[in-house]
């Protein structure tokens, strides 16, 4: 092998959802990238629930897509049941979700990775990082060492190890080292990282037993078909991308189920003290649900197919680490599961994660230059959260190599910005998942406008290819044309258009009204307006029609939110120099100094969001920073 085989611009460790998006983003941004994975066959594997999207999560997927990422396109190629959640609510909280064929999804991701220029995949476990210990400057990463002793060099490394760092699986009182069921953990790498100046703790997640769907009685369950018409996930997608569609099903646990669980709690590693890591609040185990909601006589279970050509189903709602004999009993006590055959046991897995307050907004570690962390190792849970972080880390790893400034969206620009800001400012003591409620500017951060918010920035940074840019530009131009067409038309009580509106829509035009403003009426939308002969048929692109309608219907709310953002931005981006001496700010309490020293915010906006930070402390900081700026100018 030539020396060039071992030298890259960026090395990505891990081929999961964070790792694949990181490697793809790095390569799209122009960096020669190496993706190292334990097993090439599991690149893009869905380790837990075979689903993409959902409340808050779908927003992240759309943002990944707007920046040229792979997740949405793979979901379109693999989605076998599609739903728009919160469809009856406002556009800010509507979310796209698909049940995916896990084999089709993995194949789609692997094909995208294989086709990406400047990206090389190599199968190897990483045992250590090569780190240059600086004397006059900070430590910096120089490469990695694999389990077989190979040394790969790169000035940027992205670590996306998922649950593999010192991973430990629990089933009852049985426990053993693993990265996930059937895969070895990254034990040596975890030990090496604990020797470095990182704050490391343990988290836990879990998964339910898998069931042979042919052994279930669907006659006693409720059918849950997908939406019609079918949505798509990618802005480049179309319904014809989807494979054959199937239904999911809904059933419930029984009081017998709960009795079985209560009688076996002493054998649960969650309640025996065997598991130390904290699990996800919003995806609790069935043991947790039975204990925490003791008054409930049943819990809902979503019976979700794992694929079109496999018999296995995923019983969403019964994640468990109880002993296998208890799992079998509780499964067979569920409505429709009396004859159920378990194909794989449920289990809990503990793993190492890093305090994300040790990261910059770029996801570069503060302790080691050029080293980026993304995904579950930052304390998050979920494919979508991991993939979004991976894209950001991969992009910034490439920009680090090229000597370009790091990029990270603000809270008012993207859910990705909310995610990163929450992590690096507040940290987390439990697996963090995204919800729309976490975003204070969610009316601005809708699924439908993720491309308008981010594709321009993605194009400037090399993430967006010509085909996506052409599609995006054409869409934006079509929105502008249609908006201009309708805003140029006026209906009055006496003119022909006013009479047409009254006849076609049953709407009285009592005064001169701009046609576009008619959409503001609660009973009207773009589609109904197009029934007016002079106005229709309108545009045939549903995305264009949606943008025209939302921009008009919510213009007042959007304007007020933009004003609010402008006020907040007055000091939001005021930078705080690296290594800033908070002890030198007269008037800051010791408590506030300690909080600031611990988080080391990069700008005033981040400092404001530190728990316990007072307006007075922020004012003192601003005065000190302004005084220092004037001193430098003088």
UniProtKB/Swiss-Prot annotation:
Kindly indicate whether the keyword Flavoprotein belongs to this entry: yes
Protein residues bound to FAD = 14-19
Binding of NAD(+), residues: 279-293
GO-annotated biological processes: tRNA methylation; tRNA wobble uridine modification
The record's PROSITE patterns line, in alphabetical order, gives:
GIDA_1 (PS01280), GIDA_2 (PS01281)
Instruction: Quote the InterPro entries the UniProt record gives.
Output: FAD/NAD-bd_sf (IPR036188), GIDA_C_N (IPR049312), MnmG (IPR004416), MnmG-rel (IPR002218), MnmG-rel_CS (IPR020595), MnmG_C (IPR026904), MnmG_C_subdom (IPR047001), MnmG_C_subdom_sf (IPR044920)
Q: Name one Pfam family in it.
A: GIDA_C_1st
Instruction: List cellular component terms (GO).
Output: cytosol
Do the record's keywords include Glycoprotein?
no
Q: Which cofactor does it need?
A: FAD
Mind listing the UniProt keywords for this protein, alphabetically? Answer: Cytoplasm, FAD, Flavoprotein, NAD, tRNA processing
SMART domains in alphabetical order:
GIDA_assoc_3 (SM01228)
What GO annotations for molecular function exist for this entry? flavin adenine dinucleotide binding
**In which compartments does the protein localize?**
Cytoplasm
* Positions of disulphide bridges: none
Q: What does this protein do?
A: NAD-binding protein involved in the addition of a carboxymethylaminomethyl (cmnm) group at the wobble position (U34) of certain tRNAs, forming tRNA-cmnm(5)s(2)U34.
What do we know about how this protein assembles, alone or with others? Homodimer. Heterotetramer of two MnmE and two MnmG subunits.
Q: Which family would the database say this protein is a member of? A: Belongs to the MnmG family.
In Swiss-Prot or TrEMBL terms, this protein is called tRNA uridine 5-carboxymethylaminomethyl modification enzyme MnmG
